[in-house]
Design a protein with these regions (language model features):
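Short acidic/glycine-rich loops and adjacent helix/strand connectors
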Residues: 1-206
């Protein structure tokens, strides 16, 4: 449902959901009851009312005419930022996601008895919903895969083969996500000078 909401608000589905999450902070969840008609969680099952959606029909549009009947015509990026109504729609969708995530987390804790939670998948990048799970104190520890979206599938595949299929010992523990390129100060300084930018140097950045 969040992908449909994202597209309805003028953004790219399955890509710009983070923009909707950010936009939701500027609205009020006035339309939450409508979103509750679309999707609910019941005893381990996520139940969608597909009459609100069109993504399963094979086209490019994720939301249906029924979605439009409830909320009105879709908006452009500019309109959703400027008009309060669309901010409220974003806030309502986010509020439902928060509730769903907490309900799922509570159900998992009850079913498994495990005190630690690991979150992955695209929705795992929704820091607002993750924060609600954290605040609920359902789990003792929560770990969120930094590459929670599709790119992280390769990590999961590699670990599955190594640990499960090859039965190899788990030697690597991920303690940070800072795996990018590393540069020295003189390289930074050279790039800044080439770009003719002003700068200040601090020896202590703590």
């Amino acid at each position: 449902f969040y992908a449909a909401l994202t597209q309805y608000l003028g953004y790219k589905a399955n890509s710009d959901e983070y923009r909707v999450m950010g936009l939701s902070a500027y609205g009020e969840p006035k339309y939450k009851e409508i979103f509750e008609k679309m999707v609910r969680f019941d005893e381990g099952n996520i139940i969608n009312d597909n009459s609100f959606f069109a993504y399963h029909l094979g086209g490019d549009i994720c939301y249906s005419e029924k979605f439009i009947e409830y909320f009105g015509p879709p908006c452009s990026k500019e309109e959703c930022v400027d008009e309060k109504k669309y901010k409220d729609i974003a806030a309502s969708g986010q509020e439902l996601l928060n509730d769903l995530m907490v309900k799922i987390a509570r159900w998992l804790r009850m079913k498994t008895g495990i005190q630690n939670l690991s979150i992955a998948g695209g929705v795992g990048l929704n820091s607002v919903a993750n924060g609600k799970i954290y605040e609920s104190k359902i789990f003792k520890d929560i770990w969120i895969q930094p590459a929670a979206y599709d790119a992280g599938c390769s990590i999961g595949c590699a670990f599955y083969i190594w640990n499960q299929l090859l039965n190899k010992k788990r030697e690597f523990i991920m303690t940070h996500a800072y795996w990018g390129s590393e540069y020295k100060n003189d390289e930074y300084e050279s790039a800044i000078k080439i770009s003719k930018l002003s700068y200040e140097y601090y020896s202590n950045i703590e």
